[in-house]
Swiss-Prot record:
ATP binds at G166, G168, K169, T170. Residues 339-466 are annotated as: Domain IV, binds dsDNA. It comes from Deinococcus radiodurans (strain ATCC 13939 / DSM 20539 / JCM 16871 / CCUG 27074 / LMG 4051 / NBRC 15346 / NCIMB 9279 / VKM B-1422 / R1). Residues 77-121 are annotated as: Domain II. The gene is dnaA. This is Chromosomal replication initiator protein DnaA. Domain I is involved in oligomerization and binding regulators, domain II is flexibile and of varying length in different bacteria, domain III forms the AAA+ region, while domain IV binds dsDNA. Pfam families: Bac_DnaA, Bac_DnaA_C, DnaA_N. SUPFAM superfamilies: P-loop containing nucleoside triphosphate hydrolases, TrpR-like. One of its GO terms (molecular function) is lipid binding. Gene3D superfamilies: 1.10.1750.10, 1.10.8.60, 3.30.300.180, P-loop containing nucleotide triphosphate hydrolases (3.40.50.300). Residues 87-122 are annotated as: Disordered. GO terms for biological process: DNA replication; DNA replication initiation; regulation of DNA replication.
Amino acid sequence: MSQEIWADVLAYVRKNVSDLEYTTWFAPVKPLGVQEGSLLLGVRNSFTKDWFRDHYLELLLAALRSLGAEHPQVEFQVLPAAQDALLLPNDPPPAPEAAAPTPKTKAAPTPPPSTPGDNRKTLNPKYTFENFVVGPNNNLAHAAALAVAESPGKAYNPLFIYGDVGLGKTHLMHAVGHYLAERFPEKRIEYVSTETFTNELINAIRDDKTTQFRNRYRSVDLLLVDDIQFLAGKERTQEEFFHTFNALYESNKQIILSSDRPPKDIQTLEGRLRSRFEWGLITDIQSPEYETRVAILKMNAEQGHITIPQEVLELIARQVTSNIRELEGALMRVVAFASLNNVPFSRAAAAKALSNVFAPQEAKVEMTDVLRQVAAHYGTTPDLIRGSGRARDIVVPRQVAQYLIRALTDHSLPEIGQFFGRDHSTVMHAVSKITEQMGKDPELAATVNTLRNRIQGKEEEEEVGA
């Protein structure tokens, strides 16, 4: 996970140094790990090591503090020559001894269309179907993307996926690309953001390279275009994309588009484009609910080979409810906090790591959350509580669950009754019964209060890093 910590450090550093400083000093550094709260960095030689200590140590410490490190430490290690060559692959290659000068007025040639072997060059290797967590918020979009990957140009063309930022639209698009590239290595795949498409078109017009530009985008088998809403108001780009769309569609080539809104809500989008975007399937992705957020965090931890207690993942999932990008960022912050402060993963550590970035909030409580916590406390199962059993060891947990759902959610009595397979009068009786019993039975009152705090994530935590 030191790679991820170093990536966040670099993001901080980049805002505080010049491009030349960044490229010269920071880009070649390689993170070697976190040992007893100290970030270990590999550098090329002793001169670089001394230079960092004299000129950039305070900047690095400030970057680590921004990640939650209370007593940040950085150690530098000179890499052996062989390891240096292995770990520093991004250094620029030496210039040819007799390279011919390039005239300044000559534009670089437009890259040719993808050829077999390089059809994933525009795809993010991290975005695949295997690591896409499916939940009620995205199951239709996932199913549609998988169908398109199985039968490109036939199932749904175009596939239009919309939703707020950070919910997985781009992930699904890249997943289709990887799936297709795996099955058909000869297929030509192109992923592009609308902004990049527009900028490349402008450059092509300026350099009289429109033919090459059109050949590039109209000769692909799969075109993935992100943030298509940014076509709005760009008449020349809309004109070009209209003809690109037609060329691909008429050749039965697959088109996948993403947006933050459905086609009908994209203002100043030409009607002919809007109608074409609606030819295939339009599907949306919503914010993930609690269980899906926990599953996403669990997958991220497993991929990073990090063992994090379930209760910590649950706390993060309750704290961050907006989108997946922020959810993953919160997990990274918790990991960095624990690693850099040399403390174990715990609810207290997670709460402290997130306290300065994600303000505590009353996360929305779901009926399934309540049911799961009550079942765990009473040593039974959600299915038994929702079942028809009349034994006391089932009836009491059932009534407690109904009471807490009524108290902690906005669900109506009929909705709660439907969830339990009963009518609203049964729920009303359960709420009244538990309310009455809590006034007479301190032990029951304490149990209900404990469950309430646990469900809301308000249990007392031990101090961390005090």
